[in-house]
């Protein structure tokens, strides 16, 4: 399975943007978890973090080297228009584009549709689509913010998130990062996505989300 060729060439990201569409507690939590993990791995390895940029206010004259979108699987036309406006701000074709999709546990098909639209939007602009993760947790995952990251409830999502962390740190697609790191890239979806589902039965998971 091939992704955009540039995404298979590692690149140290000097600047990065994190964009949540729409703004919600769940998407904010997922981006927080990603950024926290990136920072933790940077501390452990003694490497520097990419500088955060806000696309709508960045006046430094340089586009972001990488961008991570956090979106819902029910991305409507208005939200997709906001995504495309953000992509138009990137300018250069060297930008690596990643995505975190919050999806319904029962209907992962919608996530496939959203990912397909996002990838097409990147390809139309010549941007490097680098895949991402689909968090099949439904709504309410922000309730796990204070749960152990590798505990029973968060572990499947944390393991998927760590694959995204590795790709962002390498500045390449998740698939290529997995191959470079000796991991298994065979379980990736056709769009370079990692799907993560709860490790507990649905009734227990749903009860946990109501707390």
Question: Can you annotate each of these PLM segments?
Answer:
Residues 41-60:
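A short beta-strand-loop structural module common to alpha/beta enzyme folds
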Residues 12-47:
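Short, charged N-terminal beta->alpha structural module
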Residues 1-17, 58-59:
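Short boundary motifs at domain starts and secondary-structure transition points
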Residues 1, 56-125:
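Helix-loop-strand module that forms the ligand-binding subsite of alpha/beta enzymes
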Residues 133, 137-211:
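Glycine-rich phosphate/pyrophosphate-binding loop and the adjoining helix
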Residues 34-46, 86-90, 118-126, 161-169:
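Hydrophobic, Leu/Ile/Phe/Ala-enriched alpha-helical segments that form helix-helix packing faces
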């Amino acid at each position: 399975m091939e992704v955009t060729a540039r995404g298979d060439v590692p690149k140290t990201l000097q600047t990065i943007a994190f964009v949540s569409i729409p703004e919600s507690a769940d998407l904010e939590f997922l981006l927080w978890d990603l950024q926290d993990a990136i920072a933790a791995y940077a501390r452990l390895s003694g490497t520097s973090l990419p500088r955060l940029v806000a696309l709508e206010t960045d006046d430094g004259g340089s586009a972001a080297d990488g961008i991570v979108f956090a979106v819902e699987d029910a991305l409507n036309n208005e939200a997709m228009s906001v995504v495309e406006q953000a992509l138009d701000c990137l300018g250069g074709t060297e930008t690596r584009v990643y995505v975190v999709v919050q999806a319904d546990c029962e209907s992962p098909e919608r996530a496939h549709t959203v990912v397909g639209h996002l990838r097409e939007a990147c390809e139309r602009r010549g941007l490097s689509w680098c895949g991402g993760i689909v968090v099949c947790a439904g709504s309410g995952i922000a309730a796990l913010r204070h749960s152990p990251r590798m505990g029973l409830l968060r572990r499947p999502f944390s393991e998927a998130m760590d694959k995204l962390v590795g790709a962002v740190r390498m500045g390449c697609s998740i698939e290529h990062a997995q191959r470079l790191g000796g991991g298994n890239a065979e379980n990736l979806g056709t769009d370079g996505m990692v799907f993560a589902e709860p490790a507990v039965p649905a009734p227990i998971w749903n009860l946990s989300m109501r707390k």
